[in-house]
A protein has these predicted regions:
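Glycine-rich phosphate-binding loop and adjoining helix at the ATP-binding site
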Residues: 99, 103-122, 129-198
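Basic amphipathic alpha-helical segments that dock to polyanions
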Residues: 17, 28, 39-52
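Conserved phosphate-binding catalytic cores of ATP/NTP-utilizing and phosphoryl-transfer enzymes
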Residues: 54-76, 178-199
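Short glycine/proline-centered loop/turn elements that form peptide/ligand docking sites
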Residues: 3-7, 21-23, 38-41, 45, ...
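Short beta-strand(s) of the beta-wing in winged-helix/HTH DNA-binding folds
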Residues: 24, 53-54, 59, 143
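Extreme N-terminal segment that seeds HTH/winged-HTH DNA-binding domains in transcriptional regulators
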Residues: 1-25, 29-30
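Gly/Thr-rich phosphate-binding beta-strand-loop-beta motif of the actin/hexokinase/Hsp70
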Residues: 63-100, 200-209
Length: 209
């Protein structure tokens, strides 16, 4: 069992590699601020778990060439859903956050939002056998700690335990967040705000309050 410190270190290394696409151990040390021995130990563990793969050697002009590592994109996939009044939009990504497929389910004609969500997930989980996680972005009032949609007037929802519903049905880890938070987190972790301690994320999308 991994302790919490090692889990944190591995998370930092994985985020570094997802943002850079590939890196040597020295580059990971520089980006994360972790010690050389910590990075080496974590990278070796990730290689054994097949979460990382070797991506060749660097073009060093002298001395020993360094090994380049990257996330094993084929390890599994993730499903992300964006819940909006006009329909459910989503993507399937690999472990490097590269989009493999865009998915959608229009709402209207009496289609229940929860039915649309489950129909999308039924199809994608049947097609992708190694789904590692599901992320859901929703508008409205959310209880982040309990992972509950407290109120979503566009859907007529009150106190919907969406995370629990999805996890019970598919036995796949699911995380619920507000659409705006999800966008801001992505930019901070992998987008244009990566490395910034403070930044402002603005969205003009409907429901972005």
């Amino acid at each position: 069992m991994l302790d919490q410190i090692k889990i944190h270190n591995i998370k930092q290394i994985m985020l570094c590699l997802m943002a850079r696409r590939c890196a040597t151990k020295a580059e990971i040390v520089e980006d994360t601020g972790l010690s050389t021995s910590t990075v080496s130990s974590c990278v070796n563990s990730l290689l054994k778990l097949k979460l990382l793969v070797v991506n060749g050697m660097d073009d060093s002009s002298g001395g020993r060439r360094s090994t380049i590592y990257r996330v094993n994109s084929a390890y599994g996939c993730f499903i992300g859903l964006d819940l909006r009044p006009e329909g459910i939009q989503g993507v399937v990504t690999d472990c490097e956050a590269q989009i493999l497929k865009r998915i959608s389910f229009p709402l209207g004609g009496g289609t229940a939002p929860l039915h649309a969500i489950m129909e999308l997930l039924n199809a994608e989980i049947a097609h992708n056998k190694n789904v590692l996680g599901i992320g859901v972005g929703a508008a409205g009032k959310l209880d982040y700690e309990e992972q509950i949609i407290v109120s979503a007037p566009e859907f007529g929802w009150q106190f919907v335990h969406l995370k629990e519903i999805i996890e019970r049905q598919y036995m796949v880890f699911t995380h619920l967040d507000h659409q705006i938070n999800a966008g801001a987190i992505y930019e901070g972790m992998m987008g244009c705000a990566r490395g910034e301690k403070h930044y402002l994320y603005i969205s003009e999308a409907p429901g972005g309050k």
